[in-house]
């Protein structure tokens, strides 16, 4: 493993960077504390060790253009301490702009050396190249950003191309750009950093704010998304397979290593409203051989390829809530996640669907949280798309212990699948698939509406309760919506597939993390 050293200059500022692949970090000191914190996300989420320091060159060098081949300046230089503002006690901040440019340039050049190292190793191993491009989205509470990165653009005109669309930086400030400062970090200089980094990296990068009203969250989400996209693009180069945000055709994420202990949980809950039993096993695919037992067998520890794992997933339902659409949604979620999920519920559906749907989601989320344990060594984040019919949904998931759920799905029908409100036919749009009633059959309205169908408000509540009780953050984003009668069923099943696929990637144990938690804090919130 070779070091990746670079030096860059802008005005009176010099930046020196070293990046090592898959090693612990050293120190980051740009002179702007929030920028230090953001660059540290590359270590936690990109799995690269970053050392970067900036300083003031008291006698400007003869040449001020950046170059990773330049030696450190001979002129006296005052370097900034990590996590300490360079202008403390001063009214002027003369070097802010140059710090963003020099730090971005030096870091980009250092990252380029890592790319060249991985590309060289991939060429030696003759891995069938999938390219060096990836998309990733990282959420942070109400915010999430999208990073689209290509480390080796085929079109030479796109080398160094950078598009940054993160404004407004928060919604609690006047003007169209949002907040001007985060600590002593000037938000207006954010594009300068990314443009300088991308130019030195020779990549093609688009950073886009999808959601977010908190400036800190928006910018941190962007840095995390880039870090994850960078790691995913490196992995594409290394093993010749796709990484990053999973497409609907990507299939399951195969387990990489055996967990230290079984990741299982079981809960039973009985109230005047519902009686529920839930069991989950994160590491045991649904095997056909288990069917006579009525439950899952213990995982043998065999590491399965994605193809073999997908072939072993049992497609028969083990979810019985009494609400047909809810059964379909949870079954699809479990299938896409590649986990074993057993749910049984007897509820007061003679009232409506509320108590059964809510209590199932709460209990399932609690089981998932318990099975995940301390989350040490997990990938932690997952991004995936799902589709059903003409609907396409993206799920962005973080097992962060920071509960938050957000969705823009257009759930504009009273019942999932568009059941006729008057119950005259009992048939939802699309042939009766939503209610469990055969097409053309005309039961009394009460038979249809009282608890046998899932209302759209409870579909939202199911995803919300599951996410919060799992102590995770999840965003659902509608990428395509037919909008035709009954479209809410297509959205529901596409969302379930996306959620499950994102979950399968988030719960995957990454041996490169050596049992550590993927967080710049070193731990997750309790």
Task: Give the location of each predicted region.
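Structural preference for solvent-exposed beta-strand-turn elements
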Residues: 2-64, 68-70, 74-526
